């Protein structure tokens, strides 16, 4: 009988990536097949996020529901991973004895051994250690599930912003070797992936080891990924302004594969609040980065994160944030009311902004951003946008859907063979959360590169010297 696995994922794109790797890993080692129905699963995994308020209580509420399933099926294995697992550790077991496995973001690769331990001994196991890059060395080969894919290039963060739990839950910055990243991207390209999104908590701090003992910077990695045939779009997330260096900006001048869209969190427009957050930059320095970016790529569109109601935020501080939003003219944003995270320096600050004031400021900020989003969308009316077709539309199975380079969802009439390919679409209608258009050019009418597998590249470029020894000649 086929064994079933169900994973519930909360949080960031890194968590989504980790969950996909868990499913692939347990599929390859134990033969588990994915199920959307928790009630029919043999293993239930909860991949958690601790960024938002009451994250722990949300976890224990879910575990309470899963406990009922375990009462019906005592052989059911329940595991908790992610950032809440890193924070809570053994405490999860004390509050929820139904949990068999507690693992951190850096120990998910040990899940097969943990499951074997539980199945063999019927005793629980907790492993929330930080074994650095070992995680990536033990994960299965990448498997494409469409024309877009996430590729993790680094883990952790060294910035220790006062509001953030990431350094405590995912550890400090560790970069994957550049060759490992490039080989994974090439494998995905060979499976039909056309767009990659490079992931990291602080992705522009990437410093990956090279095969010859050197160090590959993030700017160099971007150019190397862009050189892989079949990869026509590159995104990345998330960045920190203090490491958004000139060499990264220069990539926007000469690498068209890098999309004209950037998520660069600023959090606040007030220098006083930025100092309290330990962001290590000012609003003026942030604006200087944006000026350089727009000089390198005039059509670039920007998004940001904003924390509303940080301890000590005055009306004047908030107005400085609103001024920054207007001056930069952000396309989109992810904005949240501040909530204290246990164990962070900000948790010891006096949270003196009332909830009503926080909600009012959030409404004002989001309303302004929504106006700017609509303005950007209206400017696209009548323009031709290149779309990567991701599949059928959620609005109608008779239509296709895909994203522009600036991350707008576009619905249009097309044929099934377009899925996984690029098409040029004229925008004919602007809706609240999407666009509509008409196909004016198919991929066959474009001059795009054909992907090659890593094996075919090696075979094509392999030479033999006078002794018959194979050498690689790029």
Curated annotation (Swiss-Prot):
Location(s) in or outside the cell: Cytoplasm
Keyword tRNA processing annotated: yes
Domain Radical SAM core intervals: 143-375
Cofactor note: Binds 2 [4Fe-4S] clusters. One cluster is coordinated with 3 cysteines and an exchangeable S-adenosyl-L-methionine.
Record keyword Protein biosynthesis present: no
Cofactor(s) the protein requires to work: [4Fe-4S] cluster
Disulfide bonds: none
Pfam families on file: Radical_SAM, TRAM, UPF0004
SMART domains per record: Elp3 (SM00729)
Reactions the enzyme catalyzes: N(6)-dimethylallyladenosine(37) in tRNA + (sulfur carrier)-SH + AH2 + 2 S-adenosyl-L-methionine = 2-methylsulfanyl-N(6)-dimethylallyladenosine(37) in tRNA + (sulfur carrier)-H + 5'-deoxyadenosine + L-methionine + A + S-adenosyl-L-homocysteine + 2 H(+)
Gene Ontology MF: a single term: 4 iron, 4 sulfur cluster binding
Positions of [4Fe-4S] cluster 1 binding: 12, 49, 83
Boundaries of every MTTase N-terminal domain copy: 3-120
EC number: 2.8.4.3
Taxonomic superkingdom: Bacteria
HAMAP family documented for this protein: tRNA_metthiotr_MiaB (MF_01864)
Subunit structure: Monomer.
Recorded family membership: Belongs to the methylthiotransferase family. MiaB subfamily.
Protein purpose: Catalyzes the methylthiolation of N6-(dimethylallyl)adenosine (i(6)A), leading to the formation of 2-methylthio-N6-(dimethylallyl)adenosine (ms(2)i(6)A) at position 37 in tRNAs that read codons beginning with uridine.
Name of the protein in question: tRNA-2-methylthio-N(6)-dimethylallyladenosine synthase
Organism: Serratia proteamaculans (strain 568)
Name of the gene this protein is made from: miaB
């Amino acid at each position: 009988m086929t064994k079933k696995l169900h994973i519930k994922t909360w949080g960031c794109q890194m968590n989504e990536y980790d969950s996909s790797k868990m499913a692939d890993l347990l599929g390859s080692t134990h033969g588990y097949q994915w199920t959307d129905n928790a009630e029919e699963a043999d293993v239930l995994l909860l991949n958690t996020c601790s960024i938002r308020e009451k994250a722990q209580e949300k976890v224990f509420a879910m575990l309470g529901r899963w406990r009922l399933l375990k009462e019906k099926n005592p052989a059911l294995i329940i595991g908790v991973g992610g950032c809440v697992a890193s924070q809570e550790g053994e405490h999860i077991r004390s509050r929820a004895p139904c949990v068999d496995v507690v693992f951190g973001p850096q120990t998910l690769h040990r899940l097969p051994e943990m499951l074997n331990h539980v199945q063999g001994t019927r005793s629980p196991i907790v492993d929330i250690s930080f074994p650095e890059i070992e995680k990536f060395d033990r994960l299965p080969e990448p498997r494409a599930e469409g024309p877009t894919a996430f590729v993790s290039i680094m883990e952790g963060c060294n910035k220790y912003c006062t509001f953030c739990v990431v350094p405590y839950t995912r550890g400090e910055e560790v970069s994957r070797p550049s060759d490992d990243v490039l080989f994974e991207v090439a494998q995905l390209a060979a499976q039909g992936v056309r767009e990659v999104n490079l992931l990291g908590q602080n992705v522009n701090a990437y410093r990956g080891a090279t095969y010859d003992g050197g160090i590959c910077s993030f700017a160099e990695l971007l150019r190397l990924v862009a050189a892989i045939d079949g990869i026509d779009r590159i995104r990345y997330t998330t960045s920190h302004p203090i490491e958004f260096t000139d060499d990264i900006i220069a990539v926007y001048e000469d690498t068209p594969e890098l999309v004209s869209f950037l998520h660069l969190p600023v959090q606040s427009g007030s220098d006083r609040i930025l100092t309290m957050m330990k962001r290590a930059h000012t609003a003026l320095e942030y604006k200087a980065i944006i000026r350089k970016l727009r000089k390198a790529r005039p059509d670039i569109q920007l998004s940001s994160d904003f924390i509303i109601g940080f301890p000590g935020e005055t009306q004047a501080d908030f107005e400085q944030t609103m001024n920054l939003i207007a001056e930069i003219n952000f396309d989109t944003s992810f904005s949240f009311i501040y909530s204290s995270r246990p164990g962070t320096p900000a948790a010891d600050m006096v949270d003196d902004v009332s909830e009503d004031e926080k909600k009012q400021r959030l409404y004002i900020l989001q309303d302004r951003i929504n106006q700017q989003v609509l303005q950007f969308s209206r400017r696209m009316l009548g323009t031709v946008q290149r779309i990567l077709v991701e599949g059928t539309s959620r609005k109608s199975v008779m239509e296709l859907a895909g994203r522009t380079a600036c991350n707008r969802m576009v619905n249009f009439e097309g044929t099934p063979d377009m899925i996984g390919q690029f098409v040029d679409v004229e925008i004919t209608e602007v809706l609240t959360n999407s666009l509509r258009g008409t196909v004016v050019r198919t991929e066959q009418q474009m001059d795009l590169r054909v992907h090659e597998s890593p094996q075919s590249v090696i075979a094509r470029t392999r030479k033999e010297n006078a002794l018959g020894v194979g050498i690689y000649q790029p």
